[in-house]
């Protein structure tokens, strides 16, 4: 079987970019069981309620749903079990320091295969208030409208 190259997206957490201000992103490996890898290769996963927690100098991913592999038997995994993230020690120490400051959390943004290995993109994030979310939406709509008008002017269809 030929070796995989490139990046194949499995799941994205679109809600995270809406609910949080993303301050910094990291790429982490995942410790998975065999049936989890097969379920991911089938393109089935959900990051919606996921978050990362630091315990004993290790980072664990919680509430990420990887459904049971349909062809699996008694070796199947628990769909919402916690999974260990693989990061460099310096990155873990940096995340520990930042999350202890308060108001910051670690959330998963996307889950993908990179060169045949399962990876998760995690972000150091600060939660947004409802008025911040509305303000960001209004800014995005205004920018979209402005680019639409500028495009029309460039084409001479004012």
From Swiss-Prot:
<dbReference type="GO" id="GO:0070929">
    <property type="term" value="P:trans-translation"/>
</dbReference>
<dbReference type="InterPro" id="IPR020081">
    <property type="entry name" value="SsrA-bd_prot_CS"/>
</dbReference>
<dbReference type="Pfam" id="PF01668">
    <property type="entry name" value="SmpB"/>
</dbReference>
<comment type="function">
    <text>Required for rescue of stalled ribosomes mediated by trans-translation. Binds to transfer-messenger RNA (tmRNA), required for stable association of tmRNA with ribosomes. tmRNA and SmpB together mimic tRNA shape, replacing the anticodon stem-loop with SmpB. tmRNA is encoded by the ssrA gene; the 2 termini fold to resemble tRNA(Ala) and it encodes a 'tag peptide', a short internal open reading frame. During trans-translation Ala-aminoacylated tmRNA acts like a tRNA, entering the A-site of stalled ribosomes, displacing the stalled mRNA.</text>
</comment>
<dbReference type="GO" id="GO:0005829">
    <property type="term" value="C:cytosol"/>
</dbReference>
<dbReference type="InterPro" id="IPR023620">
    <property type="entry name" value="SmpB"/>
</dbReference>
<keyword id="KW-0963">Cytoplasm</keyword>
<keyword id="KW-0694">RNA-binding</keyword>
<comment type="similarity">
    <text>Belongs to the SmpB family.</text>
</comment>
<dbReference type="InterPro" id="IPR000037">
    <property type="entry name" value="SsrA-bd_prot"/>
</dbReference>
<protein>
    <recommendedName>
        <fullName>SsrA-binding protein</fullName>
    </recommendedName>
</protein>
<dbReference type="GO" id="GO:0003723">
    <property type="term" value="F:RNA binding"/>
</dbReference>
